[in-house]
C-alpha cells in the first residue's frame, strides 16, 4: 500500500521564509498567524492527512459507496470515522470567518489543508472543503 507523507518541511519553508506570513500580523485575519501557530497547524494537518486520510483511500477504491434501496448510503470502511475527526479537528473551517464558526486564519492555511488532501489522492477532498465556498 502506498504511503503518503505530507510535505510539512517544504510547507513551513514557504509559509515562514517565502510568504513571511507573520509579517502581515497587522492585517485582519492574520493576527493569529504567528510562526508557532502556523507551524502547529501545518504539523497537525500533515499528521492527520498522512495517518488518517491517506490510509483509507484503498478501502474507498475497493469498496466504494453503496446506495441501499431505502435511500441510505454506506461509505467505505474508515470514511465515517475520518470525517468525524476532520470535523472535530476544525479542518474545514481554518480560513472561514469566526462569525460563521470559522477560525479566522488566512486563506492560505485552508489551502494548505486542501493541498495535503489532494496530494494524498483523497477523492473526497473537494467535498470536505467546499464549505469555504459557501461562506466566501
Walk through the language-model features, giving the residues of each:
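Amphipathic, small/basic residue-rich leader segments at the start of a protein or domain
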Residues: 1-125
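Single conserved hydrophobic/aromatic residue that forms the stacking wall/gate
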Residues: 128-136
Amino acid at each position: 500500500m502506498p504511503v503518503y507523507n505530507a510535505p510539512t518541511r517544504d510547507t513551513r519553508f514557504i509559509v515562514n521564509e517565502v510568504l513571511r506570513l507573520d509579517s502581515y500580523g497587522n492585517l485582519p485575519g492574520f493576527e493569529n498567524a504567528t510562526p508557532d501557530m502556523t507551524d502547529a497547524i501545518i504539523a497537525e494537518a500533515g499528521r492527520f492527512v498522512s495517518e488518517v486520510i491517506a490510509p483509507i483511500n484503498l478501502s474507498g477504491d475497493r469498496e466504494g459507496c453503496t446506495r441501499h434501496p431505502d435511500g441510505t448510503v454506506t461509505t467505505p470502511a474508515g470514511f465515517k470515522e475520518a470525517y468525524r475527526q476532520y470535523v472535530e479537528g476544525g479542518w474545514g473551517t481554518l480560513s472561514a470567518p469566526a462569525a460563521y464558526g470559522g477560525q479566522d486564519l488566512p486563506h492560505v492555511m485552508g489551502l494548505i489543508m486542501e493541498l495535503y488532501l489532494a496530494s494524498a489522492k483523497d477523492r473526497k477532498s473537494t467535498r470536505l472543503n467546499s464549505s469555504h465556498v459557501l461562506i466566501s
